[in-house]
Design a protein with these regions (language model features):
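CRL adaptor-proximal regions
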Residues: 1-8
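Short, surface-exposed helix-loop/turn micro-motifs enriched in polar/charged residues
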Residues: 5, 28-29, 49, 137
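Helix-boundary capping/turn motifs
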Residues: 8-11, 119
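Short helix-loop-helix/strand-helix junction enriched in hydrophobic and basic residues
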Residues: 10-17, 25-46
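Charged/polar low-complexity intrinsically disordered regions
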Residues: 42-244
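Charge-dense, low-complexity intrinsically disordered regions
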Residues: 246-256
């Protein structure tokens, strides 16, 4: 029995194989195995990215939103056909942004660990897998990180500032609280040393984000909102917006 040639495989079937892969390294490897695989990847990059992306990135929707705004801020037209540009540039930038998010989250976890060592943060027995940050809390951190970065991108580009205002006006009080808390941590409580990721929490984009988020949060507090919070012994220096056991305090804020 003869073995069918790859050229006889319908592109739709090859596309489904790409979409079932676990990460983009597997996508790249498969694309290099034959011309038909390479061309299928180039021609169907958009649906492949949307299928594989959520398995690679936490908060993929927010990651794509950030990338879209970065491209708009830089005047880059977003490809409509899912062609070669999306198959290379967009994926590479998504991965670069994700490395920045991971580096920031790791820095936050280290911050929590230091506070626990100093006796300023007690999450449970030493060595417990939930001592510092649970997966759900890391996901909450990443969501806010991408959102704050997106706000900074929009606010630092004159033609996108109205989008930043709309974004913040549509945030829930809980989301706005997390944005303000992350801005406070990012500006005041980290060394801004993220190696080769290229992340700089003091550049003009991030500073623009901090400023506008602080403006909106202060405006909310001026409306007479109370500022609930748990005992400082159970949070690192009063930060509480990302932890599972303190979410009930965020729910105490009144809607805007």
């Amino acid at each position: 029995m003869s073995v069918p040639l790859f050229s006889n495989i319908p592109p739709e079937l090859i596309c489904r194989v790409f979409e079932s892969l676990d990460d983009f390294s597997e996508v790249a490897a498969l694309a290099q195995t034959g011309r038909i695989f390479y061309h299928t990847w180039r021609e169907h990059a958009a649906p492949i990215c949307r299928a594989v992306g959520p398995r690679v990135f936490r908060n993929f929707i927010e990651a794509e939103r950030l990338l879209d705004m970065q491209e708009k801020a830089e005047g880059i037209s977003q490809p409509q056909d899912g062609g070669e540009q999306e198959s290379t540039v967009r994926v590479k930038r998504l991965m670069s942004n994700a490395r920045c998010a991971a580096a920031a989250c790791a820095d936050w976890v280290e911050f929590c660990q230091i506070q626990d060592t100093l006796g300023a943060f007690d999450r449970g027995p030493e060595g417990s897998p939930e001592t510092y940050m649970r997966p759900s809390e890391c996901a909450r951190f990443d969501y806010t990180f991408y959102s704050l970065w997106t706000v900074g991108v929009m606010q630092s580009a004159l033609h996108l500032q109205r989008h930043a205002s709309t974004f913040l006006e549509n945030c829930t009080v809980q989301e706005l609280c997390r944005l303000d808390e992350m801005a406070t941590w990012a500006y005041n409580y980290n060394e801004n040393e993220f190696g080769t990721t290229g992340l700089d929490l003091r550049d003009e984009v991030w500073m623009a984000g901090y400023e506008v988020v602080s403006k909106y949060w202060k405006a909310y507090l001026k409306e007479g909102a109370t500022t609930p919070g748990p005992d400082a012994h159970y949070t690192p220096i009063g930060f509480f917006a990302f932890f599972d056991h303190t979410q009930r305090y965020l729910d105490m804020y009144k809607d805007r």
